[in-house]
Structure formats: C-alpha cells, structure tokens
C-alpha cells in the first residue's frame, strides 16, 4: 500500500496531489530528522521557520490543486556559498560569518519559483577550497556511512560540498545544491553514495554563487536518483540575464526514457586509460571493470581511448585555481561587507589585518601562491602556460568525442580513487595533497567545461559506497544521464541503507 | 492522510529489496576488459625530494605579502608556498608551441551584452546593511596612502 512512497520526487509529488502526504508534514519530519542527525554537521544553518512557512504555502497550493511544479513542497538544501536573501551566507569562513545577502542566487530563486522548501544551508570547506569538508569554521562534516561516528574514527563526507552530499545521503532532503570547480560535487557524491551532477559550464547560472574559480565554477546537483537529479536540473538550468557566462541557447528540458526503453546498441563508451593512475584502489578498479563489462553485455560498443594530457591536468588546475583565487579574494577588505578588523592605522593595515583574521591558512596560502604565479616575471611561465596546456586537455576531450569514425559518446572512469577515507588519515595530509589525490579524475571535466556525473555502484568491503563517473561532450546531459540511469537500474544501489541511518531510526 | 514515520524508510528498504535483481558478481566478466588493469606510467615523476633550489627569497615574500595583503605567518605556510610552486613547475616542460591560451571554454560563443540602462537599484539601505561601519550613506575607511608596515625586514 505504501509502495508509492519510495522517496522519488515523482512519488512524493503524486502523494501531495492526492492528499496522502502533505508538504508541511514532510518538512516537519525533515527538520526533525536533521536535528536528530546533528552529529553529521551537514548543515551550517537550518532554516526551520522559513521552511515551515514555505511548506504551508505549498500546502495551500496543493489544496487549490495548483502546485507550481513537480518540485513544489519538496525539501531541498543549499550549499552555504549560494546567496540566500535574508539568510546568512558564510562560505564557512570567518570573513563572511555575519554576511546576510540582500538577494537570492538565480539557482535559489528558480528553486523558489518552483515551490521547493529551503531546509537550510549546508557545510563546506572554507570558500569551497578543499576536498573533504574538513576546513570549515563550523567543524567538519561526517559521512553517514561511517562505521563509527565517534571520536576520530569517522569517514569524511568529501568536499567541498560535503554538507549537501551528507544531507541527501542521510535522507534529510530529497536533493541539494552544491558547486563544482574541480570535483566539489562529484567527490562528496562518490563518498556519500548519492548521484552528483556537474552540468556543462554555462548551462546553470552562477549569479549569486560566491566565486572561487570563475572559469570553472558550476552549480552542482545532489539527489538519490538520476530521475530526481533531472527534475532539479530542469528547474535551475537555462540562460540568465544576470550571468553573462550562461549559454544563450534556450534550455530544452530533459526527459529520460524508461529504463527498459534504453537501447545501448548505438552507444559508444570510451575507457580513458590514463584514469587508471597510481593509488586507484583494487575495489574501485573492479567496479570500473565490471560496469564496463555489463555495458558491453548490453550491446554498447566499449573501447579503450587515450586522453594523453590527463596527468598534466591536476597541475594546470592547481595553477589556475590559485591564480583566480588570488584575484577573486581581493574583494574581501572589510569595508563594504564581511569581517572588519579593529585596526584603524591605515587602509592597507585594515585590509591586511581583516584578511589575516578572516581567512584560514589554506585560503591565505592559495592567495600568496596565486600572486607569485602571476608576478610579472612568472606570468608567462605559469599562468599563460597553464592556459595553453588547458587547451591541450580540452582538445583531448574534443578529439575522443568528435573524431569522425571513432567518436565515443560517453567516457566511463572512476570518480574518486578510493572509498571515503577516515578523517584521521585524511587530515594527516596537506590541503594540496588532499586535493591533488582526490581531484585526479574529476577536475579534467572542469578544464574542458563538459558535463559529468558520479553515480554510486556498490559497497566496499568496509561497507562504504564506491562510485563511477560518466562524462560526455558539452550540452549532452540527455545522453549522459540516460546512460547513468541505465547503470543505476542494473546496480540497484540503495542510497538509504547506511548503518548509521538505521541506528538513528531505532 | 498517511502519517509519515521513520518506519516508511524501513518499509521502502524491504520493498526495494523484494524485487531486487540478483546482485552483480564483480568477479565475473563476459568480455575481455578494456579497462587497464595496471596503472599508466606516471608522466610526472614526484619531484618533492628536490627541495634544494629555493625559488623564493625574503624580498619576494615581502612583495607577495604586500600584493596579497595577507601575511605569510609561519614556517609551515612558507613550506606550503614553496611546495605549491614546485607543483606548478611540473608543467613548464610540456611543449605548447603554437597552442593558444584557453581563457574560457565558451570562447566560441558571443558574450551577452545588455543595454546600458538601469534595470534595478534603490537598494542603498540593503547594501549598506552589511558594512560594519557607515557614516550617513557612506562606507568608512581609515586614512589611505600609508604603506603597509612590514616586519621581518
């Protein structure tokens, strides 16, 4: 009898329509669950009053049989680097601890127009600089799949959008918004066992997303199924007059075929050999191998391809990231908004002290390194050079996607090299090494601006999610997510099966 | 109306399991695999031991601190800076003759321009609300044109 309640947004929506469920009740439950799982530290700030008010409005719309969309009344969480009108937006930093934006990011306002309920703002690495959600002034986010949530024995959620991933994985909301500059959506999705989509660069507006690396940043989507992910994408994607870097052609809403209608016989899957790098765990390798095999069994053409500049990508990414960070962070001076130090000796002194107090070591070092790489004597050697190699990396992709007779439609790779690491092992590494290892497979897609999705496949020996990544050419989300949906149906990964969640429910 | 309870989740798990297809066997393959079973040789050998050539002197550090308006406040930070520069050095030998820089992946599309007219505004109070110190309708800063005081000369 309750079969229709298997947590897909579609089923919740139809239950709202026929009155078996109500947005208010679902939201109340979500708030309660979020409070009872506070130990995860997924949220920087819950917005229960706002959420319940929005849920009530949604409920009235359903009573009048006039829901705004399929997402009406669905609780959603947003990473705390997206501006939310009159709700503090901190970037998990002291610098923006008291910042209250007067406006909504486009992603947030489109979700509002669709009638979603904002459950709260989620945790991240300070200014989204990290791969673990361990560098937040509000403390680290824990992974719901951890064997043990106590002391230092828990697993990291991944990052930088770890709070959003953790919230979806723990069943606190149906979807969440993150951002993805080098893998910040796909990496935590991989560790937390949820779907994580990085759309084509320019498909989703960045207006109101506090910038990290403008030439790579995209809003990302977390959901427990590919179908739910598509519903969110359909609401937030498309041109925006407030972001001149959005792609101008109108967005055609995606509509995925039913699983049994998906025909893989005309689809060509590429396995880029360079993505088997040192440090890839045997379990991830076996997962990658098996999924390539079942795709081939289903009739897809599977072939090995080469993206020769892959290994250079992480270095190029690191250079461009630090250069753009040095420039982007120049806006924080304490005068117009954000933290202001008590130092009135001079303007420069105020700026310096404000920034010394407002940024953590990771942010400061990236600014200093970025400015070193941008020095007049270094500009050609590092910054320009990195942009040239970036073109080679992007061309690697266009060659495999567009070479006439051998073109592939989809690339299949690991997302992360391992299962979610233990906090104590991860925090023993420097931030640079954390990112260099964890972003190996994810950041090339940001270099080329192409869409990529991480989907959970199975559990490791330790009972932790193992995920794979699919990539395709720009604006090919329809095919990318169709293949993702097919794999999802074959592997039957259960997003809400974690032991900690079951313990919390008793 | 159904009461939402935690039990629903539990129910869903059972419901999902009942029609679960046989779990995949990850050791069985039906085709010769295209996935490389050995790692690709690393094109960028680890240079981290090579810390001798000091790329950065104290004058440069002072310049960086002035440009960045953040302080390089510890040995640890200096070490990270040096190792980040070495990390960046890994790409300098990649041949890029006649390869133009890729500034944006949207280079083939025209940037959207709008008419030079006011479309929104009248939000002075909202903007000033986030400043810590204001005077009437102004932001306030301490005296300018005074160079940053730097220690560790």
UniProtKB/Swiss-Prot annotation, chain B:
Chain intervals for the UniProt region annotation (Disordered): 31-55
GO cellular component annotations of the record: glutamyl-tRNA(Gln) amidotransferase complex; mitochondrion
Protein keywords: ATP-binding, Ligase, Mitochondrion, Nucleotide-binding, Protein biosynthesis
Pfam assignment, any one: GatC
Keyword Repeat: no
Taxonomy, superkingdom: Eukaryota
GO biological process, any: glutaminyl-tRNAGln biosynthesis via transamidation
Reactions accelerated catalytically: L-glutamyl-tRNA(Gln) + L-glutamine + ATP + H2O = L-glutaminyl-tRNA(Gln) + L-glutamate + ADP + phosphate + H(+)
Enzyme nomenclature, EC number: 6.3.5.-
Compartments where located: Mitochondrion
GO molecular function: ATP binding; glutaminyl-tRNA synthase (glutamine-hydrolyzing) activity
Primary residence: mitochondrion
SUPFAM superfamilies: Glu-tRNAGln amidotransferase C subunit
Further details from the record: This protein may be expected to contain an N-terminal transit peptide but none has been predicted.
Function of the molecule: Allows the formation of correctly charged Gln-tRNA(Gln) through the transamidation of misacylated Glu-tRNA(Gln) in the mitochondria. The reaction takes place in the presence of glutamine and ATP through an activated gamma-phospho-Glu-tRNA(Gln).
Quaternary structure and partners: Subunit of the heterotrimeric GatCAB amidotransferase (AdT) complex, composed of A, B and C subunits.
Family per record: Belongs to the GatC family.
Protein name: Glutamyl-tRNA(Gln) amidotransferase subunit C, mitochondrial
Annotated organism of origin: Drosophila willistoni (Fruit fly)
Lineage: Eukaryota, Metazoa, Ecdysozoa, Arthropoda, Hexapoda
């Amino acid at each position: 009898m309750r079969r229709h309640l298997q947590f897909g947004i579609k089923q919740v929506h139809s239950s709202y329509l026929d009155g078996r469920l109500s947005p208010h009740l679902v939201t109340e439950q979500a708030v309660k669950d979020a409070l009872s799982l506070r130990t995860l530290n997924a949220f920087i700030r819950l917005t229960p009053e706002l959420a319940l008010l929005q849920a009530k409005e949604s409920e009235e719309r359903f009573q009048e049989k006039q829901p705004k969309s399929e997402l009406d009344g669905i609780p959603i969480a947003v990473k705390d680097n997206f501006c939310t009108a009159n709700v503090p937006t901190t970037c998990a930093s002291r610098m923006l601890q008291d910042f209250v934006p007067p406006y909504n990011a486009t992603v947030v306002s489109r979700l509002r127009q669709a009638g979603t309920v904002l459950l709260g703002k989620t945790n991240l690495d300070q200014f989204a600089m990290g791969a673990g959600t361990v560098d937040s002034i509000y403390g680290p986010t824990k992974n719901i799949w951890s064997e043990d949530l106590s002391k230092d024995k828990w697993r990291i959620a991944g990052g930088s959008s770890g709070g959003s991933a953790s919230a979806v994985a723990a069943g606190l909301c149906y979807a969440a918004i993150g951002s993805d500059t080098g893998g910040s959506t796909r990496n935590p999705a991989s560790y937390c066992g949820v779907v994580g989509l990085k759309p084509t660069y320019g498909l989703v507006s960045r207006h109101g997303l506090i910038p990290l690396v403008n030439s790579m940043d995209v809003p990302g989507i977390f959901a427990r199924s590919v179908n739910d992910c598509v519903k969110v994408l359909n609401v937030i994607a498309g041109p925006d007059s407030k972001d001149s870097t959005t792609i101008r052609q109108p967005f055609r809403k995606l509509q995925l075929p039913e699983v049994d209608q998906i025909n893989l016989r005309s689809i060509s899957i590429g396995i880029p050999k360079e993505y088997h790098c040192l440090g890839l765990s045997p379990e991830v390798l076996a997962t990658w191998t098996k999924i390539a095999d079942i795709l081939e069994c289903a009739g897809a053409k599977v072939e090995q391809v080469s993206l020769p500049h892959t290994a250079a990508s992480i270095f190029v990414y690191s250079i461009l990231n630090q250069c753009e960070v040095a420039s982007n962070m120049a806006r924080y001076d304490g005068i117009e908004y954000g933290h202001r130090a008590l130092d009135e000796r001079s303007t420069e002194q105020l700026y310096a002290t404000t920034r010394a107090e407002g940024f953590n070591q990771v942010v400061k070092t990236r600014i200093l390194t970025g400015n070193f790489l941008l020095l007049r004597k270094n500009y050609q050697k590092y910054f320009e050079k990195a942009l040239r190699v970036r073109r080679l990396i992007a061309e690697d992709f266009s060659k495999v996607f567009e070479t006439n007779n051998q073109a592939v439609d989809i690339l299949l790779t690991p997302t992360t090299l391992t299962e979610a690491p233990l906090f104590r092992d991860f925090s023993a590494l420097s931030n640079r090494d954390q990112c260099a290892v964890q972003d190996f497979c994810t950041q090339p897609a940001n270099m080329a601006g192409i869409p990529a999705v991480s989907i959970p496949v199975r559990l490791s020996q330790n009972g932790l999610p193992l995920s794979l990544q699919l990539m395709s050419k720009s604006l090919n989300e329809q095919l990318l997510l169709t293949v993702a949906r097919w794999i999802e149906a074959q592997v039957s990964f259960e997003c809400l099966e974690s032991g900690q969640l079951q313990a919390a429910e008793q | 109306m159904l009461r939402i309870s935690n039990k629903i989740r539990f129910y869903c798990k059972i419901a999902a399991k009942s029609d679960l297809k046989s779990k995949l066997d990850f050791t069985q393959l039906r085709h010769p695999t295209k996935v490389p079973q050995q790692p690709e040789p690393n094109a960028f050998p680890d240079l981290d031991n090579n810390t001798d050539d000091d790329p950065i002197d104290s004058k440069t550090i002072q310049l960086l601190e002035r440009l960045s308006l953040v302080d390089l406040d510890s040995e640890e930070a200096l070490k990270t800076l040096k190792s980040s520069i070495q990390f960046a050095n890994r790409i300098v030998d990649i041949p890029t003759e006649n390869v133009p820089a890729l500034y944006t992946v949207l280079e083939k599309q025209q940037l959207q321009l709008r008419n030079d007219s006011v479309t929104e505004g009248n939000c002075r109070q909202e903007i000033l609300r986030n400043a810590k110190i204001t005077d009437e309708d102004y932001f306030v800063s301490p005296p300018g044109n005074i160079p940053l005081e730097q220690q560790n000369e």
